[in-house]
């Protein structure tokens, strides 16, 4: 059926008016691959960068990463910090859980000598530190670990068992209103790690929710749901996790994509394994039987050996990475480059129904 030209003209006019009033990218077609022209930082996972649509996490925005315990939330943020530091950016880690392991961070490539770290006593103190760092304009990436550990001062000073209904949610709501504008002006990326809780009495739908009230869900430009889907074994020994990340909210590109990758204990995201898998999928790396080859040269028998070869030859790994990014982040990239999420999702908050 042919579209009404008057309606098309009216739609184009109102879309132009909305973008002029609220900013480019405030409205787009769901299937569009066009992304907002924003600076991004890689997540350390090529498949996740592709799922995000813009090549990484956006600067000047709020990002929420949530999931169950030991799913890889902190590992993912440390990978982002390492990537930012390699670009010469200044990073800060607000360790409200008092659980940051500097040895592990160093193994992931974080320059711990130049990483700003704070272990605040109260939630208000943590958020004030975030605001001060943001307003300085000198810090590029701030990670808060975690929202659940941001305890209001009144709760800390009170007795165990006292009721403090809504205090944390009110604190987060006030902080979001204050931080959002400052982050945009200073072009600072603020990442909140969050935990999952269960709603009581939910009979139908997803009973899971995140801590800290609803404000963060609405102010976040990107929300990532990270889950451990399986174990990676070397013989009988478990050496890592199979991980799936769902982009449940995305204001800079089409949302509802997902990425799968491996997190190896003590090493972080298995980048070379991703390069081998994506290289084969997009015909940059040839596979014949168990042998993998690149540009006619054999690089290993079996996925593990091919990945090891790329680790030992970073120039070749970087070449494959660059070619894949050009292919997958291009506007003409194939649709299957990032899988769609099947769940019914609230388009405003990214919550699953």
From Swiss-Prot:
PROSITE patterns: RECA_1, RECA_2, RECA_3. Pfam families: RecA, RecA_C. Can catalyze the hydrolysis of ATP in the presence of single-stranded DNA, the ATP-dependent uptake of single-stranded DNA by duplex DNA, and the ATP-dependent hybridization of homologous single-stranded DNAs. It interacts with LexA causing its activation and leading to its autocatalytic cleavage. This is Protein RecA. It comes from the Bacteria. InterPro entries: AAA+_ATPase, DNA_recomb/repair_RecA, DNA_recomb/repair_RecA_CS, P-loop_NTPase, RecA-like_C, RecA-like_N, RecA_ATP-bd, RecA_C_sf. One of its GO terms (molecular function) is ATP binding. It comes from Shewanella denitrificans (strain OS217 / ATCC BAA-1090 / DSM 15013). Residues 339-353 have a biased composition (Acidic residues). One of its GO terms (biological process) is DNA recombination. The gene is recA. Belongs to the RecA family. It is found in: Cytoplasm.
């Amino acid at each position: 059926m042919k579209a009404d030209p008057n309606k098309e003209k009216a739609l184009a006019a109102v879309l132009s008016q909305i973008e002029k009033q609220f900013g480019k990218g405030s409205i787009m077609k769901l299937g569009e691959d066009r992304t907002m022209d924003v600076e991004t930082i890689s997540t350390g996972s090529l498949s996740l960068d592709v799922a995000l649509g813009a090549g990484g996490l956006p600067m000047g925005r709020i990002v929420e990463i949530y999931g169950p315990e030991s799913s890889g939330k902190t590992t993912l943020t440390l990978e982002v910090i390492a990537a930012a530091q390699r670009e010469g950016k200044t990073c800060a880690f607000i360790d409200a859980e008092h659980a940051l392991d500097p040895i592990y961070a160093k193994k992931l490539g974080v320059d711990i000598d130049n990483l700003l770290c704070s272990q605040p006593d109260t939630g208000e103190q943590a958020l004030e530190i975030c605001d001060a760092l943001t307003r300085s304009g000198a810090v590029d990436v701030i990670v808060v670990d975690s929202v659940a550990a941001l305890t209001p001062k009144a709760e800390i000073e009170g007795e165990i068992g006292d009721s403090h209904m809504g205090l944390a949610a009110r604190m987060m709501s006030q902080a979001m209103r204050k931080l959002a504008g400052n982050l945009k002006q200073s072009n600072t990326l603020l990442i909140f790690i969050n935990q999952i809780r269960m709603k009581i009495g939910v009979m139908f739908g997803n009973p899971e929710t995140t801590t800290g009230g609803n404000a963060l869900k609405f102010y976040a430009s990107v929300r990532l749901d990270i889950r451990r889907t399986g174990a990676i074994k070397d013989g009988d020994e478990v050496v890592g996790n199979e991980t799936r990340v769902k982009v449940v909210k995305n204001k800079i590109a089409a949302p509802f994509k997902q990425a799968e990758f491996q997190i190896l204990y003590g090493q972080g995201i298995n980048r070379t394994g991703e390069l081998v898998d994506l290289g084969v999928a997009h015909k940059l790396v040839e596979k014949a039987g168990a042998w993998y080859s690149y540009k006619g040269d054999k690089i290993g028998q079996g996925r593990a050996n091919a990945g090891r070869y790329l680790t030992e030859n970073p120039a070749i790994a970087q070449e494959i990475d660059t070619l894949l990014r050009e292919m997958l982040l291009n506007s003409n990239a194939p649709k299957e480059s990032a899988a769609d999420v099947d769940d019914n999702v609230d388009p405003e908050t990214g919550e699953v129904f």
